[in-house]
């Protein structure tokens, strides 16, 4: 089963989580991981996966409406609160192709996560393990063996991001040399 789940989630991006029920008619609250709420109304079908239960289901969105900081969604065939309860905690995954193509100089986190990072002399530094949003600029967390290096994503330090090759060339910050 694990192999099948991995295959199912290949090329999929976590978009949000079904956190709780809303009302008695099977509606659910969807909190987004993404800063692209405009995509919610375009979703027709998605994969919902709950890692702790090791369960997945293909869901069809029939109604969506905005609430305060979340969306209320109705999924086809989920018409009671007891049916909706079973989907609490499921993460909604969308195909990468569902997202608009990123522009030059911009990137989605999934495009640079696990990218190889090299300095401008071609020396391997590590793999992008995480991305921290600071408000001013992102910071990539690069892991090499047991060491972590934090590199601000600004022109001074990031020389090139090759999203296709999953490769980033950096000018190492002075404090790390």
Swiss-Prot record:
<comment type="subunit">
    <text>Binds ribosomal protein uS19.</text>
</comment>
<dbReference type="InterPro" id="IPR036976">
    <property type="entry name" value="RimM_N_sf"/>
</dbReference>
<dbReference type="Pfam" id="PF24986">
    <property type="entry name" value="PRC_RimM"/>
</dbReference>
<dbReference type="GO" id="GO:0005737">
    <property type="term" value="C:cytoplasm"/>
</dbReference>
<keyword id="KW-0698">rRNA processing</keyword>
<feature type="domain" description="PRC barrel">
    <location>
        <begin position="104"/>
        <end position="176"/>
    </location>
</feature>
<dbReference type="GO" id="GO:0005840">
    <property type="term" value="C:ribosome"/>
</dbReference>
<dbReference type="InterPro" id="IPR056792">
    <property type="entry name" value="PRC_RimM"/>
</dbReference>
<keyword id="KW-0963">Cytoplasm</keyword>
<dbReference type="InterPro" id="IPR011961">
    <property type="entry name" value="RimM"/>
</dbReference>
<dbReference type="InterPro" id="IPR002676">
    <property type="entry name" value="RimM_N"/>
</dbReference>
<comment type="function">
    <text>An accessory protein needed during the final step in the assembly of 30S ribosomal subunit, possibly for assembly of the head region. Essential for efficient processing of 16S rRNA. May be needed both before and after RbfA during the maturation of 16S rRNA. It has affinity for free ribosomal 30S subunits but not for 70S ribosomes.</text>
</comment>
<keyword id="KW-0690">Ribosome biogenesis</keyword>
<comment type="similarity">
    <text>Belongs to the RimM family.</text>
</comment>
<dbReference type="InterPro" id="IPR009000">
    <property type="entry name" value="Transl_B-barrel_sf"/>
</dbReference>
<dbReference type="GO" id="GO:0043022">
    <property type="term" value="F:ribosome binding"/>
</dbReference>
<dbReference type="Pfam" id="PF01782">
    <property type="entry name" value="RimM"/>
</dbReference>
<dbReference type="GO" id="GO:0006364">
    <property type="term" value="P:rRNA processing"/>
</dbReference>
<dbReference type="InterPro" id="IPR011033">
    <property type="entry name" value="PRC_barrel-like_sf"/>
</dbReference>
<keyword id="KW-0143">Chaperone</keyword>
<dbReference type="GO" id="GO:0042274">
    <property type="term" value="P:ribosomal small subunit biogenesis"/>
</dbReference>
<protein>
    <recommendedName>
        <fullName>Ribosome maturation factor RimM</fullName>
    </recommendedName>
</protein>
């Amino acid at each position: 089963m694990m192999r099948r789940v991995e295959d199912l989630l290949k090329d999929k991006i976590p978009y949000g989580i079904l956190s709780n029920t809303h009302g008695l008619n099977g509606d659910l609250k969807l909190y987004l991981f993404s800063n692209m709420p405009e995509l919610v109304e375009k979703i027709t079908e998605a994969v919902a996966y709950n890692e702790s239960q090791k369960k997945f289901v293909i869901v069809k969105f029939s109604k969506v409406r905005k609430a305060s900081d979340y969306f209320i969604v109705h999924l086809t065939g989920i018409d009671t609160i007891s049916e909706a309860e079973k989907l609490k905690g499921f993460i909604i995954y969308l195909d990468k192709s569902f997202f608009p193509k990123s522009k030059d100089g911009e990137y989605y986190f999934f495009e640079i996560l696990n990218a190889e990072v090299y300095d401008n002399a071609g020396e391997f530094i590590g793999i992008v393990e995480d991305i921290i949003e600071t408000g001013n600029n992102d910071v990539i967390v690069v892991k090499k063996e047991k060491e972590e290096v934090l590199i601000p994503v600004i022109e001074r330090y990031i020389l090139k991001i090759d999203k296709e090759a999953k490769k980033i060339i950096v000018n190492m910050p002075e404090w790390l040399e």
